[in-house]
C-alpha cells in the first residue's frame, strides 16, 4: 500500500498536469474561435464564386480550360493529406490518416497509380513510418496559413493537372460543419465539377456580363479552385483547434476525477495510520499498567 507521502506527491503531480491541460484548453478555445471566424468570413465569397460559375455552366462545353479535362480513364491520382503539425487533439490526426490509407489501398486495388502529398508534421511522420514516398510535403498549414499558402498549393496542383501529370487531384482533410460536427472527407478538386443551378426557362433578373460570359468563366475557373483550397485549409485548422479543445477538456475533467479518488485514498490511508498509532499507544499503556 502506498504511503500518505507518496499519494500526496501523486496528487500534486496530477494537479500540475490539470493546470497545463486547462491552460491548453483555454488557448485552444481562443484559437478555435478565431479560426471559425475566418471560416465564416470566407464562406460567402466561396459560395458566391461557385454560384456565379454554376450560372455559366452551360458554356462549359465551348470553352477550352485544362481544369475541365475529363480523362477517359483515371490512371494516376494525386492525394493531398492535410493533418496537423501537433498532437494532443484526440482522433483528429489518426482518423484522417486512416482514411488516407484506406483511399490509397482502394485506388491501388483498381490499378490506379497514386502519388501522395502531405501537409502537417503528423502526416509526414505517418507516411515516413509507413515507408510511403512523398512527392511534396508542407509544414506551413497552421494558424498563420491563409490565401498565400492556399494559392501556392492550388497553383502547384493546377499545373500538375494541366500538364496531364495526374488525371485527378483529391484532398483528404477534416471539414468543418459546425462547432459540434467536424469529420474527415475526400474532396475532388480537379477536374473541376460544373454544377448547374436552376432550370431552363426559369424566371429571374437578366444578367449582363462584361466583356462576355465565356471570358469571365475562363478567368473564374482558377479562382474557384483557389478558393476551394482556401476553404479546405481554413476548415482543417478550425477543426484541429476544436478537436484539441475537446481533448484538453476531457483530460482536465479526468484529472479532476483522479484527484478526487487519490484524495479519498489519501484520507483512508492517513486515517488508518492514525488509528494504528492510537491502537499502539493504547496497547503500550495497557502493557505498562
Curated annotation (Swiss-Prot):
Gene Ontology annotations for the cellular component aspect, listed alphabetically: plasma membrane; proton-transporting ATP synthase complex
Keywords: ATP synthesis, Cell inner membrane, Cell membrane, CF(1), Hydrogen ion transport, Ion transport, Membrane, Transport
Subcellular location: Cell inner membrane
Gene Ontology BP annotations: proton motive force-driven plasma membrane ATP synthesis
Membrane topology listed for this record: Peripheral membrane protein
InterPro entries (alphabetical): ATP_synth_F1_ATPase_gsu (IPR035968), ATP_synth_F1_gsu (IPR000131), ATP_synth_F1_gsu_CS (IPR023632)
Primary location recorded for the protein, binned into one broad class: membrane
Superkingdom: Bacteria
The keyword Acyltransferase is annotated on this UniProt entry: no
MF annotations from Gene Ontology: ATP binding; proton-transporting ATP synthase activity, rotational mechanism
Ranges in coiled-coil conformation: none
UniProt-listed PROSITE patterns: ATPASE_GAMMA
Family to which the UniProt record says this protein belongs: Belongs to the ATPase gamma chain family.
Function: Produces ATP from ADP in the presence of a proton gradient across the membrane. The gamma chain is believed to be important in regulating ATPase activity and the flow of protons through the CF(0) complex.
PANTHER family: ATP SYNTHASE GAMMA CHAIN (PTHR11693), ATP SYNTHASE SUBUNIT GAMMA, MITOCHONDRIAL (PTHR11693:SF22)
Assembly behavior: F-type ATPases have 2 components, CF(1) - the catalytic core - and CF(0) - the membrane proton channel. CF(1) has five subunits: alpha(3), beta(3), gamma(1), delta(1), epsilon(1). CF(0) has three main subunits: a, b and c.
Protein name, entry field: ATP synthase gamma chain
Source organism per UniProt: Leptospira biflexa serovar Patoc (strain Patoc 1 / ATCC 23582 / Paris)
Gene: atpG
